[in-house]
C-alpha cells in the first residue's frame, strides 16, 4: 500500500540523521496511517519524516525533500497509490537506465494525465536525488548545486545552492520530455500486430533519445550515459509492457 511503501523512503533518511531505529518507527507510523487511507498515510508519514529531518539539524535537507514531495499529491491527487512511484526515477538512475522510467510511468498511469505527471515527477525526484547525494544518476546536478554539507543546515542556503540551480537549469526540461514520452507511449504501441507494435516502440524510443540529445545540445548539458543502449532497452520494455497490457485486457473473468 502507498503508506507502507512511502515509509521506507523517510525511514532511510531518518536513519542517516538519528541513532533511533528509524525503520521501525516509520513502519509503525505507516501501518497506523495507512489504516485510515493511503493518501492520509502518505501525507502523515511524509510530514513526520520532514519534521524529523529538520529537527535533527538539517532544515535545508528537509526543504529540498519537501520541494520534491510537494507536487506529488497535487499532480496525482486522484491516484494516491502512485504517490511513491516517482522513486522509480532515481532507482533506475542508480542502475544506469534512468531513461527507462517513462516506460514504467506509462505502464502505471492508467490515463494520459497520470502518465504525464508520473513521468515528470520521476525525473524531478531523480534531479533532487542527484542534488542530495552528489551522484550522477543521469545528467548530474547543475554546476550551481554545491555539496549538501554547505546547505543542509540552512533554509536560505538550501534554496540558493540547491533548489534555485535545479530550477534554473535547462536540464529540468527533461521532465517535460519524460512526461510527453510516458503520455504518448500506450498510443504508439497499439498496432494490430507485434511487428507494428515493435515499430511504434522503436520510433518512440528514438524520438525520446533524440529529444533528450537536442536538449543537451541546446543547453550544453552533459551527455547521457549510453543513450543508444538505454534507448534500445526502453523500446524493448515498452514492447513487453504493451503486450502484457493487451493480455491482461483479454484475460477472461473467472467466477
Residue spans for each PLM region:
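Core alpha-helical transmembrane segments of integral membrane proteins
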Residues: 1-57, 66-74
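Alpha-helical transmembrane segments in multi-pass membrane proteins
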Residues: 3-8, 25-34, 93, 105, ...
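Short, aromatic-rich membrane-interface segments at the entry and exit
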Residues: 17-26, 39-43, 58-65, 81-85, ...
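Cytoplasmic membrane-interface segments at the C-terminal ends of transmembrane helices
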Residues: 30-40, 73-82, 106-114, 182-199, ...
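Membrane-interface helix-loop-helix junctions at boundaries between adjacent transmembrane segments
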Residues: 31-32, 47-117
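Juxtamembrane/interfacial segments around transmembrane helices
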Residues: 37-38, 49-57, 76, 118-126, ...
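A cytosolic-side transmembrane-helix exit/cap motif
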Residues: 44-48, 65-69, 82-88, 106-109, ...
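Generic multipass alpha-helical transmembrane bundles of integral membrane proteins
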Residues: 91-235
Amino acid at each position: 500500500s502507498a503508506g507502507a511503501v512511502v515509509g521506507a523512503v523517510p525511514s532511510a533518511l531518518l536513519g542517516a540523521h538519528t541513532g533511533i531505529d528509524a525503520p521501525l518507527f516509520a513502519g509503525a507510523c505507516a501501518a497506523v496511517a495507512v489504516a485510515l487511507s493511503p493518501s492520509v498515510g502518505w501525507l502523515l508519514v511524509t510530514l513526520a519524516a520532514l519534521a524529523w529531518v529538520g529537527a535533527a539539524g538539517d532544515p535545508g535537507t528537509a526543504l529540498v525533500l519537501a520541494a520534491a514531495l510537494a507536487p506529488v499529491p497535487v499532480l496525482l491527487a486522484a491516484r494516491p497509490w502512485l504517490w511513491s512511484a516517482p522513486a522509480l526515477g532515481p532507482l533506475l538512475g542508480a542502475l544506469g537506465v534512468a531513461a527507462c522510467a517513462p516506460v514504467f510511468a506509462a505502464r502505471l498511469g492508467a490515463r494520459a494525465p497520470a502518465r504525464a505527471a508520473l513521468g515528470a515527477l520521476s525525473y524531478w525526484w531523480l534531479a533532487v536525488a542527484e542534488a542530495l547525494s552528489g551522484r550522477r544518476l543521469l545528467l548530474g546536478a547543475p554546476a550551481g548545486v554545491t555539496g549538501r554539507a554547505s546547505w543542509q543546515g540552512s533554509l536560505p542556503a538550501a534554496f540558493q545552492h540547491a533548489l534555485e540551480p535545479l530550477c534554473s537549469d535547462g536540464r529540468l526540461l527533461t521532465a517535460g520530455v519524460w512526461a510527453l514520452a510516458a503520455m504518448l507511449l500506450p498510443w504508439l504501441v497499439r498496432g494490430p500486430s507485434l511487428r507494428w507494435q515493435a515499430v511504434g516502440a522503436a520510433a518512440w524510443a528514438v524520438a525520446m533519445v533524440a529529444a533528450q540529445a537536442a536538449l543537451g545540445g541546446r543547453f550544453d548539458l552533459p551527455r547521457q550515459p549510453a543513450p543508444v543502449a538505454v534507448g534500445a532497452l526502453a523500446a524493448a520494455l515498452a514492447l513487453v509492457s504493451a503486450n502484457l497490457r493487451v493480455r491482461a485486457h483479454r484475460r477472461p473473468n473467472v467466477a
